[in-house]
Amino acid sequence: MAGVAAGGALGAWARHGLGSWLTALLPSTFPLPTLMINVLGALLLGFVAGYGIERGRLPEAWRLPVTVGFIGSFTTFSTWSVDTVLLLDAGRWPLALANVGISLAVGLAAVWVGRRLAFRWRV
């Protein structure tokens, strides 16, 4: 459990740092930083699932700290949900719908790509 907590702390710290940097770099009415972080997290989880878990390269003791702890706290469904509701409240329903559609499509694609990369990795 301590490993999951440590992974969670590191993931939250990484998410905050990257989110702040992306927000300053890419100011927009669309929640692009949240989308980018969630897609990166989906890619990472797909890779870890394929390379680390399915191919047995990640020791059992590291699986939960990396997946549930780090990647789970790095990505965030709640921030994505709030971003979408705020767009709806502001009357920007086309952006809200785009956020939902793009996040779902690109997130699933990122997991798929991550797994494909994992199975091509030769180590």
UniProtKB/Swiss-Prot annotation:
A Gene Ontology cellular-component term: plasma membrane
GO biological process: cellular detoxification of fluoride
Signal sequence interval, chain numbering: none
Sequence positions that bind Na(+): 72, 75
Coiled-coil parts of chain: none
Transmembrane segments: 30-50, 68-88, 93-113
GO molecular function annotation: fluoride channel activity; metal ion binding
Topology relative to the membrane: Multi-pass membrane protein
Highest taxon in the source lineage: Bacteria
PANTHER family: FLUORIDE EXPORT PROTEIN 1-RELATED
Protein name: Fluoride-specific ion channel FluC 2
